[in-house]
Each structure stands twice: as structure tokens, then as C-alpha cells.
Amino acid sequence: MNMQEVYEYLSTVLPEGHVKQDEMLKNHTHIKVGGKADVFVAPTNYDEIQEVIKYANKYNIPVTFLGNGSNVIIKDGGIRGITVSLIHITGVTVTGTTIVAQCGAAIIDVSRIALDHNLTGLEFACGIPGSVGGALYMNAGAYGGEISFVLTEAVVMTGDGELRTLTKEAFEFGYRKSVFANNHYIILEARFELEEGLYEEIKAKMDDLTFKRESKQPLEYPSCGSVFKRPPNNFAGKLIQESGLQGKRIGGVEVSLKHAGFMVNVDNGTAQDYIDLIHFVQKTVEEKFGVKLEREVRIIGEDKE
């Protein structure tokens, strides 16, 4: 299918300015890397997402979905077909102790809305930079909390564009993983069940977690957060630090001097710089400690020709 034709058709379906050709995806990731998307669309509602999916299915066009790009490395060759950004699907409603949040809402914002309504349970998320959809996809967590602890159900869209409601059990949550890595469902909204609490206590906990994050993590540079999952009975950052890898640099990307579990873009790094550094760290840690570090960050897209 000619991508010009795809662009022209989708421009009639989505609002003006929400369909682009050859969009640089580095503008849509936290680490500021990524090549071009053939066609980039940013739907504003579920009907528009359905229209994109049905059109793509009809002509067998590959579709890739993005949240806010906080935990993903997009390769320098970009993404073929249609890239769908969900950052405009951001509605949040509160009813009693229940919060329903759409996929593109920032999980940080949802935690603050919970605070404003004196609801406890999402304090751990006050520093997680991902979207609600991304948080469910990887069962995001921090400081002892996880999305799976407060999620009750979610609305998803199948690869055929049908809406379904799934209970938490269907997600098959594990440590930094869910069933969504292996199926073609798109997370549209999540329902969180929280508990009533005291504003001052909730805020104090969030302030404490924010202080810990700011003091320990290299927030002054672009990064994708923790690169590796925590290995059993150990910590990735500790193993990397004890391997003498802090400050190790490939191209414009280096292992953070502030937190060894992070890789930061210090000088116009590329996706390939990140990937090469990840492989180097994995190889070094395995040789030194016999531990295979598993990536937490997703890598998608095509290599640069």
C-alpha cells in the first residue's frame, strides 16, 4: 500500500494536524532517539482508533501503538506502516473510591488526582513517567507498589477493533510484565479501586518518594528509566556498579554516574548507541557474575540502512 494514499485517507478521518508523514519519532520518546514513522497518527477518541485499525486490517498495513514513549527505544530506521500515538486519549473520572483513567493519561497525573480526592493506593506511581496504558502493559511499579495491586478491570480493543472489558485476572500480571506483550489488544482505559485516606498522609508519602527519586535518579538527562529488570535476589544497578561500568559510554549514551541502572543520553545519542551499550553491559555482568540481565525497556522499529 502506498503510504501517500494511507496518509491522505487517514487525514480525512482524524482532526487536522493529527496525521503526519515521515514524523521523527525521537520527538515522541523520553530518550530522544528514533527514526521516522511512515505515517504517524494521534487519535482523539476510540472511534478514530477503530477506524485506523479497520483500515490497516483491510489493506494489511502494520500498526504500532505508542504511549508517551517513556520505556521504549525506537530504532534509528524508524517504524514502517502506521504508528498510533495515544497521548490525546487522556480522560480521568473519579467516582467514590474508583478512578477510571484512559490509556494516554500520565500515571503521575492520575496519582495526583487520587491525592486531590483523598484516595490512597497510587502514591508509588507519583514518579513513574509512563502513561496508564504503558503502566498496565508492563505492570509498572516502584517503592513496593505495583499497578496490579490497585487495578480491578480494563477496557481493551482487539486487533479487529472490538471493545472488551477484562478483569485483572486476565492480565496475567507478573514482575514488569502482563499478557499484553503476547497479544494484539490495545489498552484503552483502566479502573483503579483505591481507599479513602488523609490528604496530609498521602501527600507526605508522595513527597518522600519524590525526594528519593530526585536524589537517586539522573533526571537531568533523557533516559528510559530502569533499563533492566531486577534479577532474583539482586539488583541490576548494584551488579552494573560492581562491574565498574558507571560512566561507560558508547556514542552519546552512557551508564549514569548517579544511578547505574539508568542509561542517559548525554550527547545526541542514537538508538544504536543505546542498544550497543545494553549488550555491552549484559555481556560484562554475565561474564563477571554469571547473571543474565533481562531488559525492562522495549526495543521496536527497524535498523537504519
From Swiss-Prot:
The record's PROSITE patterns line, in alphabetical order, gives: FAD_PCMH
> Which Gene3D superfamilies did the record assign?
3.30.465.10, UDP-N-acetylenolpyruvoylglucosamine reductase, C-terminal domain (3.90.78.10), Uridine Diphospho-n-acetylenolpyruvylglucosamine Reductase, domain 2 (3.30.43.10)
Enzyme class comes to oxidoreductase
Q: Does the keyword NADP apply?
A: yes
Question: What's an example Gene Ontology biological process for this entry?
Answer: cell division
UniProt lists the family membership as follows: Belongs to the MurB family.
Query: What name does the UniProt record give this protein?
Result: UDP-N-acetylenolpyruvoylglucosamine reductase 2
The source organism is Bacillus thuringiensis subsp. konkukian (strain 97-27)
Lineage in the entry?
Bacteria, Bacillati, Bacillota, Bacilli, Bacillales
